[in-house]
Amino acid sequence: MSTVTITDLARENVRNLTPYQSARRLGGNGDVWLNANEYPTAVEFQLTQQTLNRYPECQPKAVIENYAQYAGVKPEQVLVSRGADEGIELLIRAFCEPGKDAILYCPPTYGMYSVSAETIGVECRTVPTLENWQLDLQGISDKLDGVKVVYVCSPNNPTGQLINPQDFRTLLELTRGKAIVVADEAYIEFCPQASLAGWLAEYPHLAILRTLSKAFALAGLRCGFTLANEEVINLLMKVIAPYPLSTPVADIAAQALSPQGIVAMRERVAQIIAEREYLIAALKEIPCVEQVFDSETNYILARFKASSAVFKSLWDQGIILRDQNKQPSLSGCLRITVGTREESQRVIDALRAEQV
């Protein structure tokens, strides 16, 4: 009689699943953390709600109203969740039949689209971007049959560039009546003029993902948003957990989205952009750096000679970057989060010392 193990009892797709390799999961013993696109210094808040004996609101009113005002949409067009990652998953759960429907995304891009779909048992289709990392619209059109959700990250992680708005319009026309198009705007605060939030009235099948993890400097809070038309939001409300945000999270999020909080965020963005330009200019002069790509975000993608050796050398010095070698078309590439001036200087000095 064969013995059935606990692993045998698990779903086949979970047994075969490779979990998302988050920056924290990859570990390291660094003191210069430039691998997760976090803000480099902590922001401070005081808790104002002393009601931890009560369950929180499912969709905290102050958070929703503040975010709607900030994003220029109606409160009915906002859903708050445990990070934008939960929003990615909710869209698949609401719109995709496991074993029947598919999602589509365009690598090189963020890894959670595929992990969320595979966890739920939904097929993943990929259409790699063109050489300039823009959308291959013909390739997408050819693979749309049976696709219910299309994910497009703009600005794209890890490449750092915006998707051409005209290509977004073409994609939205291609998918009208067929699929939800999700614009992942996790980094939009660094290029706010490029947001698609103003397009919601025109495209009922558009959804937009946002987060407080980047420009708002609250990665540890785990608070994200989905912006969409009310019909989409109502469907997502059916599948979200009853209490997605704890009371302290909602309390701090509402403060971060106050008028003073928005001003502080914009000051942080200006500081990071200035530091990004300083770091880009320095990287271009370093012998082991082959190419530095333009960025609209708080990180820089660069191609290195002997990138694996460079990555390990900096790792051993306590400078933790993100290796992108396994991503399509990113051979030799490392991603560097823009940190403080001191952190930038540590990176620059370490790279200058590399004998490649």
From Swiss-Prot:
It is an enzyme of class 2 (transferase). The modification N6-(pyridoxal phosphate)lysine is found at K214. The keyword Amino-acid biosynthesis applies. Pathway: Amino-acid biosynthesis; L-histidine biosynthesis; L-histidine from 5-phospho-alpha-D-ribose 1-diphosphate: step 7/9. Its EC number is 2.6.1.9. Transmembrane segments: none annotated. It catalyses: L-histidinol phosphate + 2-oxoglutarate = 3-(imidazol-4-yl)-2-oxopropyl phosphate + L-glutamate. GO terms for molecular function: histidinol-phosphate transaminase activity; pyridoxal phosphate binding. Belongs to the class-II pyridoxal-phosphate-dependent aminotransferase family. Histidinol-phosphate aminotransferase subfamily. This is Histidinol-phosphate aminotransferase. It comes from Escherichia coli (strain 55989 / EAEC).
